[in-house]
Each structure stands twice: as structure tokens, then as C-alpha cells.
């Protein structure tokens, strides 16, 4: 009954594609089709393929989504400090490939805090014909004295630093690891009405 959309979340399978692994591309598409059919039947409003480290696996999930569902799809990869995915894909290549396959929004999530994500967003924006997503962590993770992972960026700082991503060209905004309701509320306060918080 509210204004929020419910997204069906899809991520990495943990399996490697041949020749490095034992799964071929068509099998991977079938794995994603099964998940997407269930999410579609459950009534989600859109699909989010996120925290992807491999462009190949992201392609498989997007192809599967387009074959078995008419729902909008957001595709989001994680990038290392060198602005490449773990498998070596740069942001411009990711954007060009995924928008050509029919993604409705392409971007980046997890990986870093807001300030370190700007380079990825800028590169994507250079070739984007669709909206760009930026969904960073609340800073970089650290281990506390008890060995637990903590994120130290407070909500107010997160909101301020998200302005940098807006300036870099992000249209869809959100928070990943370490973010709380307070972080998202801070983000809503800095966002223009034309931007979507996800």
C-alpha cells in the first residue's frame, strides 16, 4: 500500500564459468532463470542484479531476466580500488555491454565509501544512455577489537559525501554495507526530487 517498490535481489552464484570453472554460460543463464521466475511470480516490482564481480555472470543474469520476465532490471557491479572489477572489467565497458543487453539502470554497489566511488560513476556516465546507480558502503570496513566488521561513516557524513556521486552523474542512489535507516534518511535529505533512492 505504500510508495516503496519491492526489488527481487539476485547476486553471484559462487561458481566459475569454463574454462576456469565447471559451469558453462547456458547453464548459468538457466540457474538465473529459475530464480527470476520465482521472484516474478512472487510479485516483485523490479529485479536488482547486484554485487557482481564478473561481467560474464552479470550478462547471464540480465539475459535470463529479459528472457523470462518483463520487469525492469538494475545491474550493479563491484569495483576494486583500481576502478576495475575483480575479473578486470572497467566501468565504461560494463556500462556499454549491459545497456546494450537491455538493462534499465547500470551502476556500482558495495566496494567502497561514497568518495572512492566517484571515478567509477564518472566513467560510466561518459557512455551511459540510461541512468547510473551508486550504492556505496558506509565507508571502508574495519575490524573492531572483537574481530567484528564495522563501518565507521556516520549518517550525516554519508549524506554529505553522496553529493559527490550526484555531481559525478549518479541518478539512482542508495546504501550498501554498514548503512542504516539513518544513512538513507540523510541521503533522502540531500537528494533532488529527480533522483531515486534505492
Regions from the PLM with identified roles:
Residues 1-7:
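Glycine-rich nucleotide/cofactor/substrate-binding loop typically near the N-terminus or early
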Residues 7-10, 74-76, 130-138:
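Non-cysteine beta-strand/loop elements that form the S-adenosyl-L-methionine
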Residues 17-75, 81-131, 156-168:
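Alpha/beta enzyme core
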Residues 117-121, 144-152, 184-185:
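Histidine/acidic-residue-rich catalytic or RNA/ligand-binding cores of hydrolases
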Residues 133-149:
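Active-site clefts of carbohydrate-active enzymes
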Residues 160, 182-183:
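Catalytic cores of alpha/beta
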Residues 188-198:
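Single conserved hydrophobic/aromatic residue that forms the stacking wall/gate
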Amino acid at each position: 500500500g505504500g510508495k516503496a517498490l519491492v526489488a527481487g535481489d539476485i547476486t553471484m552464484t559462487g561458481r566459475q564459468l569454463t574454462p576456469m570453472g565447471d559451469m558453462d554460460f547456458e547453464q548459468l543463464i538457466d540457474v538465473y532463470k529459475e530464480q527470476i521466475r520465482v521472484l516474478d511470480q512472487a510479485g516483485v516490482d523490479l529485479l536488482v542484479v547486484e554485487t557482481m564481480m564478473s561481467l560474464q555472470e552479470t550478462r547471464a543474469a540480465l539475459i535470463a531476466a529479459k528472457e523470462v520476465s518483463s520487469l525492469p532490471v538494475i545491474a550493479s557491479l563491484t569495483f576494486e580500488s583500481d576502478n576495475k572489477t575483480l575479473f578486470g572489467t572497467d566501468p565504461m565497458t560494463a556500462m556499454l555491454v549491459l545497456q546494450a543487453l537491455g538493462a534499465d539502470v547500470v551502476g556500482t554497489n558495495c566496494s567502497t565509501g561514497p568518495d572512492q566511488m566517484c571515478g567509477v560513476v564518472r566513467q560510466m556516465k561518459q557512455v551511459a544512455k540510461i541512468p547510473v546507480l551508486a550504492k556505496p558502503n558506509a565507508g571502508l570496513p574495519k575490524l573492531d577489537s572483537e574481530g567484528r566488521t564495522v563501518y565507521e561513516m556516520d549518517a550525516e557524513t554519508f549524506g554529505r559525501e553522496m553529493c559527490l556521486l550526484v555531481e559525478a552523474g549518479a541518478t539512482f542512489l542508495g546504501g550498501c554495507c554498514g548503512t542504516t535507516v539513518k544513512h538513507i534518511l540523510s541521503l533522502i535529505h540531500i537528494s533532488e526530487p529527480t533522483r531515486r533512492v534505492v
